[in-house]
Structure formats: structure tokens, C-alpha cells
Design a protein with these regions (language model features):
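Short, structured segments at the rim of ligand-binding sites
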Residues: 1-394
């Protein structure tokens, strides 16, 4: 996103090779950006004027469906967005209303969801806009990432319940500043981005820490030790909260030059925790809580009902289907440990649900994932990596 709106070429070192990344690349290419991904270790990006007609396949990627439409407003011509069946159920209305308020033409037949078409005129005036981003921080990030391209920049005000996953917003602001944007986030729930062209540069991509959750969780379940190399000593990623969470759950967690190491103690303890800043960790944490020695409460995650699937309902149904005792309410989950049994664990085409099922399967014989291939969304090698971890790869 940032490189497509920059002056000059950019490079991405150590990019995440996954379906979500491929969809973002394809979407930008469809709009005119030149991207060379022939080297998995180093992608090269050269910006060009954006134009339609074009069609963007969002798959199930919230980043694609929420980051690219604000940029499409600066293109010339129609850009049509669509995605997987589950993606058509994900909330989009607040972002589409914000774009309309900024003068961008959006045609969604009143759905407030995929599919829709953004018809750009080559420029967006910008100015001020108010949005309720309580369903997803991605609405705000999408607007902020394109704001430097708008003639007057952008002042975005959030009005509504608290924005979830705030570390993602901090990451957005940090990266905008690194790219040369002037961003003022000193006022609560207000972000101001000055207009101006960003500068192409080399980006070193951090490892996706949230994808480490099931592997580190394996140490807690089995009483073993797992090390994830390359864990950054300083990061704004929500996945870094795993260090504190897994300590509370009963693990011994050490961060050093060799990476992050989690050692299991043979015991899992229930927790009472607010996961509003890292809702993506909920499925794996819920799986661990279902195996713990005392009840758990996971709070601040009502927004997960609008993720790849309704994760609160999905976790409740699937864990209870294995004999668990899980209750979902408006804000989160209440989990009371019970002796679990084997059975089919439906992933709902959701990569995080598949990770949760794999964790449960470490402690419960006969757990069958309905669709492990859905992990390709963010980690295509998950099945092989999991087999390697367990020493089961042929």
C-alpha cells in the first residue's frame, strides 16, 4: 500500500508468502502498480498511476477489502471489489459511508458489504470525516494509509465504542511516519495526516508473530519447549502479547538474542484477560483455556463476530461439540474446563480456527480438522511446519 503511493521504487525484504499477501499484490497490480515477486525473499515495487477498469479479488483478506478501496478513490475509472462467500458477510458499511462522505463514488446496491465498485476521478479532496471503527481498526488504517494522497490530507474522527486491536493502528501510524508522512495522533480518537508524497525505500518485514501462537502453545500443552527465532526485541505487533498471555497460562517465557522460547510446566491455568488489543489470538488462547485446570474469561472481543467467521459462535460450537463448556456473550467467552473427546472440528474456512483445532488435538485424541488448507491465508506451510514440530513429517 505505502510503496504503491510513493515516489520511486521500493523493496520488501522477507515478505509473508501467503494468500492474503498474494491477493494484495494482485489487487495493486490490477490497479496498475508494477510488482515483481519472482524472488520470495525480496519483492520490488514500482508505483504507476492507478486506473480502472479493474477487478480486485479480496478473498477473505480484511486488509485487501478495507485498505484498497480508499486508494481506489485516487485512481481513474471503476475498480470492482469482491471476495469469498464469507467475505461478503464481513462489515464494510462504515468505511464505504466514510468514502462517500469524502466525495468518492461508491456503488454497493445498499449492501454495505462486498461486492461494490469504487469509481475514482484521479483525486480525492480529503478534509475531515467521522467513522465508527468499533467493528474493526482496519477501517481507520485503510483511510490513514491513503490519506497522504488526498489533496487536503485527512482528519479522521472515531465516534463509537472503543476501537479494537489498537496495536494495529499504532503500527499503521509508525509505518506512515517511516515512509515520510506527517501524522498527528496526539488527540484521543482523532488522527490527522498531512498531504504529501511518500518516499520509496527498503522495508524489512517483521515475522508475523500471531502465526507463532499455535507453535508456542504446543509447548504449554505438551510440557515441552519451543523457540521461535527472529522474535523482535521491540515491536508494535499484537502478537507480542503472547509473551504475557502464555506466562499467565503457566508457561516459562524467555526473550533473548536467539528468539522467544516458551517452556511448558505440565500445567495450564485459567485466566481472566481483556483481548481487545489482540483479538486474533483468541482462538488459540481459547483452545488452551479449554485444556486448563480452572475457568477462564476472555473479554473485549465482541468484534470477533465480524471476522473471517463469527469466531465467538464458532469457538463455542466447536469446543462444546468436543465436550467442552463454553458460553459466548456480547463481550467474549466464558470457558469452564471439561474432559474433551475426539470429533470433527469445523474450521469455517478460518485459519485461526484451524490453529485452535490443532492445539486441542495435541491433548485430545481423534480431533479432525475439517479444512487445514485454510491456513494458507497467512501460513501456507502450516501443515508441514506442524508435522515437523511433532516429528511426524515423512
Amino acid at each position: 500500500m505505502l510503496t504503491a503511493a510513493s515516489i520511486g521504487a521500493s523493496s520488501l525484504a522477507a515478505p509473508l508468502i501467503a494468500r492474503d499477501s498474494a491477493l494484495m499484490v494482485a489487487g495493486l497490480q490490477a490497479m496498475g502498480t508494477l510488482i515483481n515477486t519472482s524472488d520470495d525473499a525480496l519483492w520490488m515495487i514500482r508505483p504507476r498511476p492507478l486506473a480502472g477498469p479493474a477487478t480486485v479479488d479480496c478473498g477473505l483478506a480484511g486488509t485487501v477489502m478495507r485498505f484498497l478501496p480508499p486508494l481506489a478513490g485516487t485512481a481513474t475509472g471503476p475498480i470492482t471489489f469482491d471476495g469469498d462467500d464469507y467475505a461478503r458477510q464481513r462489515p464494510m458499511a462504515p468505511l464505504l459511508r466514510a468514502l462517500t462522505a469524502l466525495g468518492v463514488r461508491v456503488d454497493d446496491a445498499g449492501r454495505g458489504a462486498l461486492p461494490f465498485t469504487v469509481t475514482g476521478t484521479g483525486r480525492v479532496t480529503g478534509g475531515e470525516v467521522t467513522i465508527d471503527s468499533s467493528a474493526s481498526s482496519q477501517f481507520l488504517s485503510g483511510l490513514l494509509l491513503s490519506a497522504p494522497e488526498y489533496d487536503r490530507g485527512l482528519v479522521v474522527r472515531h465516534e463509537g465504542p472503543p476501537v479494537p486491536s489498537s496495536p494495529h493502528l499504532r503500527m499503521t501510524v509508525d509505518m506512515l511516519r517511516t515512509a515520510g508522512a506527517a501524522v498527528d495522533d496526539s488527540r484521543p480518537d482523532v488522527w490527522e495526516v498531512e498531504p504529501g508524497r511518500l518516499t520509496g525505500r527498503g522495508w524489512q518485514i517483521e515475522p508475523d508473530l500471531s502465526n507463532a501462537a499455535p507453535f508456542l502453545a504446543a509447548a504449554l500443552v505438551t510440557g515441552g519447549t519451543v523457540t521461535v527465532p527472529g522474535w523482535p526485541l521491540r515491536t508494535s505487533q499484537p502478537g507480542d502479547l503472547l509473551r504475557g498471555l502464555f506466562t499467565e497460562l503457566g508457561g516459562r517465557v524467555t526473550l533473548g538474542p536467539d528468539g522467544l522460547t516458551v517452556a511448558g510446566t505440565g500445567m495450564l491455568h485459567g485466566i481472566d484477560v481483556d483481548l481487545s488489543e489482540a483479538g486474533e489470538l483468541t482462538p488459540v488462547v481459547a483452545a488452551l483455556c479449554a485444556l486448563a485446570d480452572s475457568p477462564s474469561t476472555l473479554r473485549g472481543i465482541g468484534h470477533l463476530r465480524g471476522h473471517e467467521t463469527d469466531r465467538l459462535a464458532a469457538l463455542t460450537d466447536q469446543l462444546n461439540g468436543l465436550g467442552g463448556d463454553v458460553t459466548a456473550d456480547e463481550d467474549g467467552l466464558r470457558i469452564r474446563p471439561r474432559r474433551l473427546r475426539g470429533g470433527v472440528f469445523d474450521t469455517y474456512a478460518d485459519h485461526r480456527m484451524a490453529q485452535a483445532a490443532a492445539v486441542v488435538g495435541l491433548a485430545v485424541a481423534g480431533v479432525e480438522l475439517s479444512d487445514v488448507a485454510c491456513t494458507s491465508k497467512t501460513l501456507p506451510r502450516f501443515p508441514l511446519m506442524w508435522a515437523d514440530l511433532l516429528g511426524e513429517r515423512p
